[in-house]
Every structure is written in structure tokens, then in C-alpha cells.
């Protein structure tokens, strides 16, 4: 008799996605991060749900409600810090997942890649709106500065900003709508992640060699479920170490001060995972130019498949492009560092150089060296 997991309409979907899924036998731990992102999303939705039970999205009580969660709610401090640091772990996994996709040529699965970029943008929007909710100084001024960027759009810009704010400044209406969107977006992310998986299972996973792996596949369970559990242990260990020993390591001290529209903090900066994009935004003196560069720094991922001229999918056997890839990683780390520094010499110059290098490596150097490598392989 056939097992119910192979015949039952619901169990069959789970079986084909996580149990009997044919998977290349040579995929490394870099393929772990997809499942870890799923776990991160579950952690964020669960902790967020418990926080929403006690939080009040009102300018007069939001800050004190967060203090109440931290002090009076049973394990409220832990739920809050798990949620805040869980966002950081989410972005660590997200960046490593994208990096793996770039290195091993997974971007050639166009549908999966493009849904992934939409997922990245949605996650960034969710994280930004979540950062506004505690209603501290950095929450308020971060919201003011970033939403104000819409005013750079010609003709309709200022109307668009007021429409988003729900008034003439960031106030009660803004906080309420940000809470609403922050609550609903993770469920949209979960739906998009399902579509992401659906498209991935149409083509099957790539593998480190970049070669076709159809003749050499194994079942996902038990081989990769056990392998993923190891990654999960490291993820939970990192998250709980951060939460229990250094909960405020990645947060801004200014956010422990109640939002005050009359007092601007000396350095307005977003959370660490947005600093690279913030550095690109600041490196262009023109407002519209900065906003365009900011948007393009993410959307450039969409043109990477078009700029792939190499005859090989993966970078595994392409040493010159490997050097460029790690130069790009170093460049992004430099931008992240610069984004957290004040706007003064020499940080401005370093930021501008790193911003130019970011686009130059992706648009010019990588396609150029792919063509050179194609020539070298013919010899």
C-alpha cells in the first residue's frame, strides 16, 4: 500500500517539498541559509505576535508600552530582544543567501531570483517600519529622514510624503499605519517565500560545480534535514547568545530616549543592515541622485543575469571573477562601516569611492572578466 504522505493532498505537497525532494548530492553548507531564513521568519512572526499583544501604536503610549513589555511582562525582555536581534540574524542569513546565489550562479533561475529580490525589498520595508515602532529618538528621526526621500520625486514628491505621513509630519497617523504594515508584511513574506520555493522546485537546486546534477541526486530527507539541523543549532546558539549576553550590541543608545521632534540626534543612522545602502545614498550630494543610487543598489541585482557572459554558471572554476567577488564583499563591508560614520573628511571620500566601486565591479568588471576568462578557457 502507498504511504499516505505520497497520496494525501496536503501531505503530498510537504512530501514533495521537504522529504522526497531530489537534491544534488554535492551541495555545501552554503545551501543551508534558505531553510534558516524560513526558521528566522517563524521566530520573527511568533515573537512579534506576542509583542503585538502588549504594544500600543499610539505616540503618547508606544514608548512606555515597550518599557512595560521589557519590565512587567513575563519574559517580555527576552521576547523583545529575540525579536530585535532576530531581525539582525535574518539579515545575516539573507545577505549570505544572496552572496551564495551570486557566487554559484543561482541567479540564472530567473523566476526564483526575481521573487527573491522582491522578498529582499519586502523584508527591508518590514524591518524599517519595525524600527519606528518603539518611538525612540532614532525611530522618529529615522522615519522622518527616510520617508522624506520620497520628496525627491519630481512634481508629486511633497504630496507623496504627506500622503505617507498622514499629516504634515511623522505623527500618530504614521505610527498607526507603520504598525499595521509591519504586522501584515511578514505574512506576505511567507506567501512570497512559498512562491520562491515553488519556482525553485520547478528547476531544482543549483550546486557548487554549476554542472547539471540530474544523474546524481539524493532525497532531501534524511540527508539534508540533518545537515540543516546543524545550521539551525548554530543559528539558535548565535541568536540566544546575542539576546542573553549582549542584547543591545546592535541597537542605538538614542532609541532609549523618547522621540522628541524638537531635538535632532547628532548622528541619524539606520540599523547596521541598512548602512551599506545609507552610505551610497549619502555619497551623492544631489537628493534625487542619492535616492536613485539607493534604489539601484538593490535593483542592480535584477540585471546580474543579463550581465552574465561567462560560459560557466558557477565561480568555482573562475579564479579572476572570484577575486572580483571578494573585492565586492570587501567593498560592501567598507560601505557598511562608512554608513555608521559622521559626514566629514575622510569618510565622505571613502564612501564615494566605495559607492563608485560597487557599481563599477558589478556593471563593468565582472562582465569584462567573464569574457576574458572565456578566451582563456579556449587556450
Curated annotation (Swiss-Prot):
Provide the alphabetized UniProt keywords: Electron transport, Heme, Iron, Membrane, Metal-binding, Mitochondrion, Mitochondrion inner membrane, Respiratory chain, Transmembrane, Transmembrane helix, Transport, Ubiquinone
User: Key word Signal present in the record?
Assistant: no
Q: What residues form the membrane-spanning segments? A: 33-53, 77-98, 113-133, 178-198, 226-246, 288-308, 320-340, 347-367
CC cofactor note: Binds 2 heme b groups non-covalently.
Record GO cellular component, one term: mitochondrial inner membrane
Report the outcome of residue 78 to T.
In strain: Isolate 02
Residues of the signal sequence? none
Swapping residue 226 to A leads to an effect described as: In strain: Isolate 02
**Where, by residue number, does heme b b566 bind?**
97, 196
Q: Which GO terms describe its molecular function?
A: metal ion binding; ubiquinol-cytochrome-c reductase activity
Q: What family name appears in the similarity comment?
A: Belongs to the cytochrome b family.
Which organism is this entry from? Aotus azarai subsp. infulatus (Feline night monkey)
Name of the protein in its database record:
Cytochrome b
InterPro entries given in the database record:
Cyt_b/b6_C, Cyt_b/b6_C_sf, Cyt_b/b6_N, Cytb/b6-like_sf, Cytochrome_b, Cytochrome_b_C_euk/bac, Cytochrome_b_N_euk/bac, Di-haem_cyt_TM
What exactly does this protein do? Answer: Component of the ubiquinol-cytochrome c reductase complex (complex III or cytochrome b-c1 complex) that is part of the mitochondrial respiratory chain. The b-c1 complex mediates electron transfer from ubiquinol to cytochrome c. Contributes to the generation of a proton gradient across the mitochondrial membrane that is then used for ATP synthesis.
Q: Which residues bind heme b b562?
A: 83, 182
Q: Which cofactor does it need?
A: heme b
Amino acid at each position: 500500500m502507498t504511504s499516505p504522505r505520497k497520496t494525501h493532498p496536503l501531505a503530498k505537497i510537504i512530501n514533495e517539498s521537504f522529504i522526497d525532494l531530489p537534491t544534488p548530492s554535492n551541495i555545501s553548507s552554503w545551501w543551508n541559509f534558505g531553510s534558516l531564513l524560513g526558521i528566522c521568519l517563524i521566530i520573527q512572526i511568533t515573537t512579534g505576535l506576542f509583542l503585538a499583544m502588549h504594544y500600543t501604536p499610539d505616540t503618547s503610549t508606544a514608548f512606555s508600552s515597550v518599557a512595560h513589555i521589557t519590565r512587567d511582562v513575563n519574559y517580555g525582555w527576552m521576547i523583545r530582544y529575540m525579536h530585535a536581534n532576530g531581525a539582525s540574524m535574518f539579515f545575516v542569513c539573507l545577505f549570505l543567501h544572496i552572496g551564495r546565489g551570486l557566487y554559484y550562479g543561482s541567479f540564472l533561475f530567473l523566476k526564483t531570483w526575481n521573487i527573491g529580490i522582491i522578498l529582499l525589498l519586502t523584508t527591508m520595508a518590514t524591518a524599517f517600519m519595525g524600527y519606528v515602532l518603539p518611538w525612540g529618538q532614532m525611530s522618529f528621526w529615522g522615519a522622518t529622514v527616510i520617508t522624506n526621500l520620497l520628496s525627491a520625486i519630481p512634481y508629486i514628491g511633497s504630496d507623496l510624503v504627506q500622503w505617507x505621513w498622514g499629516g504634515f509630519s511623522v505623527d500618530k497617523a504614521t505610527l498607526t499605519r507603520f504598525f499595521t504594515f509591519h504586522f501584515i508584511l511578514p505574512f506576505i513574506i511567507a506567501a512570497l517565500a512559498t512562491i520562491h520555493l515553488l519556482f525553485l522546485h520547478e528547476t531544482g537546486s543549483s550546486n557548487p560545480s554549476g554542472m547539471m546534477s540530474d544523474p546524481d541526486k539524493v532525497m532531501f530527507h534524511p540527508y539534508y534535514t540533518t545537515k540543516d539541523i546543524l545550521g539551525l543549532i548554530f543559528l539558535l546558539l548565535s541568536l540566544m547568545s546575542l539576546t542573553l549576553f549582549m542584547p543591545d550590541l546592535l541597537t542605538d543608545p538614542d532609541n532609549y530616549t523618547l522621540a522628541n521632534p524638537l531635538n535632532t540626534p547628532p548622528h541619524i543612522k539606520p540599523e547596521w543592515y541598512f548602512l551599506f545602502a545609507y552610505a551610497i545614498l549619502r555619497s551623492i550630494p544631489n537628493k534625487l541622485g542619492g535616492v536613485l543610487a539607493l534604489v539601484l543598489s538593490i535593483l542592480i541585482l535584477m540585471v546580474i543575469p543579463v550581465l552574465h557572459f561567462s560560459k560557466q554558471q558557477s565561480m568555482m572554476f573562475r579564479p579572476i571573477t572570484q577575486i572580483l567577488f571578494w573585492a565586492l564583499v570587501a567593498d560592501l563591508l567598507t560601505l557598511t562601516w562608512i554608513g555608521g560614520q559622521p559626514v566629514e573628511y575622510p569618510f565622505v571620500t571613502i564612501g564615494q569611492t566605495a559607492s563608485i566601486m560597487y557599481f563599477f565591479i558589478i556593471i563593468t568588471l565582472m562582465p569584462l572578466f567573464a569574457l576574458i576568462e572565456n578566451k582563456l578557457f579556449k587556450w
